[in-house]
């Protein structure tokens, strides 16, 4: 049996976020697992088989020169974006492959420091760039606008490009809102949450409204559960309410499904209506929530609960609420002890033990380009690298992106 290319690579990912704070694409990190040459054509065919027209655009970030050379040589026109590090262009072989790949119609992305942009003859080989702002650029970007009215404020941010390593909310907002950046990779979650520290976190207004509309349309119980699972804070608040003295249920509610069944749709809608006036409309929180949802989906896929739906839902919930401490600002153990959850969830999220810890730790590791950490987790938990990569690609291919309306 021919080994799949997914067994010879270590993959990781990072979301690309648009100016509307919606998912715009995925940066896919690809590391050679060994010194063996990776069949880049096989990798691209594997991705093509899993991807659909609605899947997010991909930016493939090869983490070795050899893998990049193979991608540049073998990728056909219409392949995902391929990243080329600026410093690697000093390698004459890579530069030659870049020029021929550009002539074949490949879409290439230059990655590097905004202060070291390529010369025009090199730059024309690239469709876009993934830029890092220098500290002095960040300071300049955040200077107040000119005092004289009518004087245009110039930005150091180049419009239409992508940016990475943006650690502050103010700089992210400058890039996306003022600098007209195409996207930012990753998200300044810590600073966004810090900027909101004086305001208790609330569930998403959009998710609450979506769930109310689904109830009005008499959609399925599975649909209600899926929508509620789009917001970790809404799911948590719902379960806290279900287990409160206000409802007086005789048995503890340990899952969203059970809570939906026990509470009844009219009562759920009344409860949602009570949440709506205080709900969050801050667009900067959308990437925070969606990142938690992707982590939950990955955790469930990695543990491959199969046909046991209750178990799959429990694993999803484990991944969804695993970072609630970041939203609520108190220890995760304290938060989870308010609910009669499965001990398996508490063990994985707080104690880092038990049957769910492998999937949860791997889902978190895959959010980075740390190949050593991913390899170590595969060894520790005896996880098959090919299956890990396949689970990752399946989850990523199912994500939805906001696309511009088709031209008439």
Features from the language model and the residues they span:
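Short, low-complexity, intrinsically disordered N-terminal peptides in bacterial proteins
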Residues: 1-8, 136, 151-152, 407-408
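Bacterial c-di-GMP phosphodiesterase EAL domain
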Residues: 1-81, 86-93, 287
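Generic structural hydrophobic/aromatic packing signal, biased to beta-strands
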Residues: 11, 28, 60, 82, ...
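Amphipathic alpha-helical regulatory segments at dimerization interfaces
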Residues: 46-50, 100, 301-305
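Conserved alpha-helical "signature site"
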Residues: 55, 142-408
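Surface-exposed, flexible loop/turn segments at secondary-structure boundaries
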Residues: 66, 116, 137, 192, ...
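The catalytic core of metal-dependent phosphodiesterases that act on cyclic dinucleotides
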Residues: 74-189, 314
């Amino acid at each position: 049996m021919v080994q799949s290319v997914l067994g010879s690579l270590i993959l990781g990912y990072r979301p690309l976020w648009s100016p509307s704070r919606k998912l715009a694409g995925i940066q896919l990190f690809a590391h050679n697992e060994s010194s063996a040459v990776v069949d880049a054509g096989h990798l691209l065919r594997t991705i093509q088989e899993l991807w659909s027209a609605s899947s997010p655009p991909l930016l493939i970030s090869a983490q070795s020169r050899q893998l990049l050379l193979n991608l540049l040589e073998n990728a056909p026109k219409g392949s995902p974006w391929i990243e080329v590090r600026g410093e690697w262009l000093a390698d004459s072989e890579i530069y030659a492959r870049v020029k021929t790949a550009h002539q074949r119609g490949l879409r290439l992305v230059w990655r590097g420091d905004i202060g070291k942009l390529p010369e025009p003859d090199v730059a024309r080989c690239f469709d876009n760039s993934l830029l890092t702002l220098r500290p002095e650029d960040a300071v300049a970007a955040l200077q107040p606008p000119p005092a004289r009215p009518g004087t245009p404020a110039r930005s150091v941010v180049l419009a239409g490009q992508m940016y990475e390593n943006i650690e502050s909310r103010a700089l992210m907002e400058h890039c996306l809102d003022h600098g007209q950046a195409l996207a930012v990779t990753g998200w300044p979650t810590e600073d966004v949450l810090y900027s909101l520290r004086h305001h208790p976190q609330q569930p998403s207004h959009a998710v609450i409204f979506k769930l109310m509309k689904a109830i009005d349309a008499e959609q399925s119980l599975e649909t209600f559960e899926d929508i509620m699972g789009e917001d970790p804070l809404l799911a948590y608040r719902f379960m806290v309410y279900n287990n409160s003295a206000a409802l007086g249920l005789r048995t503890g509610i340990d899952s969203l499904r059970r809570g939906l069944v026990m509470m009844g749709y009219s009562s759920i809608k009344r409860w949602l209506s009570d949440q709506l006036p205080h709900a969050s409309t801050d667009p900067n929180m959308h990437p925070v929530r969606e990142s938690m949802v992707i982590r939950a989906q990955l955790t469930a896929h990695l543990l491959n609960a199969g046909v046991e739906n209750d178990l799959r839902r429990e694993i999803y919930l484990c991944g969804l609420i695993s970072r609630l401490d970041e939203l609520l600002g108190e220890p995760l153990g304290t938060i989870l002890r308010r609910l009669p959850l499965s001990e398996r969830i508490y063990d994985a999220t707080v104690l880092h033990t038990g049957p769910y810890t492998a999937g949860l730790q791997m889902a978190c590791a895959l959010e980075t380009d740390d190949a050593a950490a991913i390899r170590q987790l595969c060894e520790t938990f005896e996880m098959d690298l090919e299956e890990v990569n396949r689970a990752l690609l399946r989850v990523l291919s199912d994500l939805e992106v906001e696309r511009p309306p088709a031209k008439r």
